[in-house]
């Protein structure tokens, strides 16, 4: 009987462990990597999903609605921890000169038709801890509408630009 109970306990523990591992995180960590002008670029972010909120992720004035009801004109451009950019060489992003290094990316979405990429020198922050005094600078992004709704937020690097797409929005900026 003792042996049977022990086997049952091991089986239950294994089953619980397996079922706990089957639930993916709500906003999984993602990495976009690429080379532009021979310089390696990596963007690390967490990718939220639209999850049935199409048309309700962004308000009419461009502010993102958060789960706890707050609205932020400066967005971490992802979920959870702040989005980071690393490069092994000096870049020009839009009209902003960015020396080699690691930075935090934010996006000013206060105007729904004209987003602005913010490159911030302070790294290791939670996404809502924006400090404008640490900005390296800002540059305008080119807005477009994706061909289809983008369920999972995605950053891409290639074709001489960095692009952010989510829901019915896409914004890109040239890099060289």
Regions found by a protein language model. Give the residues of each.
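Sec-dependent N-terminal signal peptides
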Residues: 4-14
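Targeting-peptide/extracellular-domain and disordered-appendage signature
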Residues: 21-99, 104-176
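Sec/Tat signal peptide C-region and signal peptidase I cleavage site
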Residues: 16-20
């Amino acid at each position: 009987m003792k042996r049977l109970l022990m086997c049952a306990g091991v089986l239950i523990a294994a089953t619980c462990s397996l079922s706990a591992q089957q639930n993916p995180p709500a906003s999984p960590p993602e990495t976009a990597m690429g080379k532009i002008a021979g310089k390696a670029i990596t963007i690390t972010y967490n990718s939220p999903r639209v999850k049935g909120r199409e048309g309700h992720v962004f308000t009419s004035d461009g502010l993102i609605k958060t789960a706890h009801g707050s609205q932020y004109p400066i967005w971490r451009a992802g979920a959870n921890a702040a989005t980071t950019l690393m490069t092994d060489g000096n870049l020009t992003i839009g009209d902003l000169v960015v020396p080699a290094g690691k930075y935090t990316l934010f996006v000013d979405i206060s105007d729904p038709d004209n987003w602005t990429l913010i490159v911030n020198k302070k790294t290791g922050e939670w996404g809502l801890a924006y400090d404008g005094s640490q900005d390296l600078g800002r540059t305008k992004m080119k807005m477009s509408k994706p061909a289809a709704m983008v369920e999972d937020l995605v950053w891409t690097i290639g074709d001489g630009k960095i692009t952010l797409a989510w829901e019915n929005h896409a914004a890109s900026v040239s890099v060289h």
